[in-house]
Amino acid sequence: MQIFVKTLTGKTITLEVEPSDSIENVKAKIQDKEGIPPDQQRLIFAGKQLEDGRTLSDYNIQKESTLHLVLRLRGGY
């Protein structure tokens, strides 16, 4: 199924995923497309931050859902 990931810059990334895919797996796909390390990615859906060990179906994420990607940058505060 396809889902969309919207970044803070307004860019939308399209990913091909399965409902059984873990959040980690989705972050790895984002890394493949965008080069962003998974440890810097925070994915938000329906106002909730998604945890690595859970799956898309755990969060009731269905085809053509849009996730929001927030980057957690290291240091600098």
From Swiss-Prot:
Enumerate the spans annotated as Ubiquitin-like domain.
1-76
List, alphabetically, the Gene3D superfamilies matched: Phosphatidylinositol 3-kinase Catalytic Subunit, Chain A, domain 1
For the cross-link Glycyl lysine isopeptide (Lys-Gly) (interchain with G-Cter in ubiquitin), the position is: K6, K11, K27, K29, K33, K48, K63
**Cross-link named Glycyl lysine isopeptide (Gly-Lys) (interchain with K-? in acceptor proteins), where?**
G76
**Major localization class:** cytoplasm
Instruction: State which residue ranges cross the membrane.
Output: none
| Alphabetized UniProt keyword annotations | Cytoplasm, Isopeptide bond, Nucleus, Ubl conjugation
Q: Which GO terms describe its cellular component?
A: cytoplasm; nucleus
Which residues comprise the propeptide?
A: 77
Annotated disulfide bonds: none
Q: At the top level of its lineage, which domain of life is listed? A: Eukaryota
Localisation:
Cytoplasm; Nucleus
Q: Which PROSITE patterns does the entry mention?
A: UBIQUITIN_1, UBIQUITIN_2
Pfam families reported for this sequence: ubiquitin
Q: Which SMART domains match?
A: UBQ (SM00213)
Name the InterPro entries for this protein.
Ubiquitin-like_dom (IPR000626), Ubiquitin-like_domsf (IPR029071), Ubiquitin_CS (IPR019954), Ubiquitin_dom (IPR019956), Ubiquitin_ubiquitin-like (IPR050158)
Summary of the function given for this chain in its UniProt record: Ubiquitin exists either covalently attached to another protein, or free (unanchored). When covalently bound, it is conjugated to target proteins via an isopeptide bond either as a monomer (monoubiquitin), a polymer linked via different Lys residues of the ubiquitin (polyubiquitin chains) or a linear polymer linked via the initiator Met of the ubiquitin (linear polyubiquitin chains).
- Into which family does the record put it? Belongs to the ubiquitin family.
Quote the protein name from its UniProt record: Ubiquitin
